[in-house]
Amino acid sequence: MANQSEKIPRATLKRLPLYYRFVNTLKSKGIDRVNSKAISEGLNIDSATIRRDFSYFGELGKKGYGYNIDSLLHFFKNEISENDEIKIAIVGVGNLGKALLTYNFSIHDEMTITEAFDIREEVIGTQIGKVTVSPFEKITDILSHEQIDVVILTTPEEAAQKVADTLVKAGVKGILNFTPSRVQTPSDVQVHHIDLGIELQSLLFFMKNYSHK
């Protein structure tokens, strides 16, 4: 999907993991077929949006039949690299960093945080889950040796851009940024900003304005 993805809306691409998780749940319940209405009800996404999303990827289903679960699983696995083992590093082992290390994508066998970095002496060398915290000064060598190009950023806001610059120089191609800082990177480095405050404000807005009364 390398070239094709450039023509697909970002919102559609961000929904692919949601579709994959939902379809995988249906598979675990022994269901072998699903239609867009059922997916819509399960994910609270308009069925027209689902059909439009799926249309970007060709014929995934048949009118009157719906979608074959095994076919959808195979497709989504390939599209979101769920068949590949992805090693991830985290920078900043504060409360949020520790929580993410403890969780460590427990429902995703293919994604694992394998490295953690911090600058504080009292944190360096400690083990959280199965990961030992390394000094940040060694990050370039370790990322290169472990072939890691995805990093979760949970540093203090004032350190975020400097850390991001170091990650770019180290060859990182994807950053999941939990800091309030809108870090700047070259166009070939993907950054997804996760601001929990903004997400909560958005939730409250939709609760106030769009909830059924």
UniProtKB/Swiss-Prot annotation:
Binding site for NAD(+): 92-97
This protein's record includes keyword Transcription: yes
Any one GO CC term of the record: cytoplasm
MF terms (GO), sorted A to Z: DNA binding; DNA-binding transcription factor activity
Compartment(s): Cytoplasm
Function: Modulates transcription in response to changes in cellular NADH/NAD(+) redox state.
Quaternary structure note: Homodimer.
Entry similarity comment: Belongs to the transcriptional regulatory Rex family.
Record HAMAP family: Rex
UniProt name for this protein: Redox-sensing transcriptional repressor Rex
Source organism of this protein record: Staphylococcus saprophyticus subsp. saprophyticus (strain ATCC 15305 / DSM 20229 / NCIMB 8711 / NCTC 7292 / S-41)
Gene name of this polypeptide: rex
